[in-house]
A protein has these predicted regions:
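A beta-strand edge to alpha-helix "cap/lid" segment located at domain peripheries
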Residues: 67-137
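Generic alpha-helical structural signal
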Residues: 17-18, 59, 94, 113
């Protein structure tokens, strides 16, 4: 039977935390691109603040944000998780981060609540197949 967790961090939380670290918070652009390409399904459905966002537009947003800002993770937590019997599942995630503008040095705090549906493929790897984000900055 599938399990639902509230307070302990799940395998999905650990996987999603690593995804965000590799995508936004480390300095290697190639690692960020490879992380996006390998962990974001080609046919992913993405919504940010009520707008549907195509995968390519989301990718450009991520790479543009990386180019313009140094990003620091302030906090993150798992809000709720459902783990599918064969792997994958759904997770509600909350994160807070600092944007430091590379040109001006201006700092802003941002936050996101994300609900991600994650599938385990035949190869055993996880991919995000659907993401809904409420993001503020």
């Amino acid at each position: 039977m599938a399990t639902s967790h509230k307070s302990e961090n799940s395998l999905l939380f650990e996987w999603l935390s690593e995804y965000w670290h590799n995508l936004l918070f480390q300095l290697d652009d190639e690692l960020a691109i490879n992380t996006f390409e390998s962990r974001m399904a080609k046919d992913v459905t993405i919504k940010i603040n009520h707008d549907h966002v195509p995968r390519q537009v989301y990718f450009e947003y991520i790479t543009g944000t990386r180019a313009a800002h140094d990003l620091t993770l302030i906090s993150q937590k798992q809000l709720k998780v459902w783990e599918a019997p064969g792997g994958g599942g759904s997770i509600a995630y909350e994160g807070e981060l600092m944007y430091n503008d590379k040109k001006t040095g201006e700092k802003q705090t941002g936050s996101v609540v994300m609900i991600a549906d994650i599938r385990k493929g035949d190869d055993g790897n996880f991919t995000i197949v659907q993401s809904t984000e409420i993001a503020t900055r």
